[in-house]
From Swiss-Prot:
Reaction(s) catalysed by this chain's protein: L-aspartate + H(+) = beta-alanine + CO2
Protein name stated in the entry: Aspartate 1-decarboxylase
Organism this protein belongs to: Pseudomonas aeruginosa (strain LESB58)
Entry EC no(s): 4.1.1.11
Cited Pfam families: Asp_decarbox
Length: 126
């Protein structure tokens, strides 16, 4: 049996560009791709915190250190500059892999400053 699990997440990144007349995709600062383990051309899910939109696209590399999150093509209708988004990648894991799986999560502060990284989400308390 395999399970689809969270592989990587960029939490509350700010959209820096929304380019309708681009080929599609989401350009992400190359440093963040490397740190999160998201691969170029990998399918990603984007959840817009500000307007509730949820959509699928693929990641492309933006210049390292640029702090860029560029939502391109038709997806540019679903996010505007300044929107806060959660970008997730998921993967299939075998039962054996699940025992040691830990997602890579990057948490962003305002201005797309990397706040911290984590491999676990704290338990939610009532």
């Amino acid at each position: 049996m395999h399970a689809i699990m969270l592989k990587a997440k960029l939490h509350r990144a700010e959209v820096t560009h929304a380019v309708l007349d681009y080929e599609g995709s989401c350009a992400i600062d190359g440093d963040w791709l490397d740190l999160s383990g998201i691969r170029e051309y990998e399918q990603i899910q984007i959840y817009n915190v500000d307007n509730g939109e949820r959509f699928t696209t693929y990641a492309i590399r933006a210049e390292n250190g640029s702090k860029m999150i560029s939502v391109n093509g038709a997806a540019a209708h679903k996010a505007k500059v300044g929107d806060r988004v959660i970008i997730c990648a998921y993967a299939h894991y075998s039962e054996a892999e699940l025992a040691s799986h830990k997602p890579r999560m990057l948490y962003m502060a305002p201005g797309n400053q990397l706040s911290h990284t984590s491999e676990a989400i704290p338990i939610q308390v009532a």
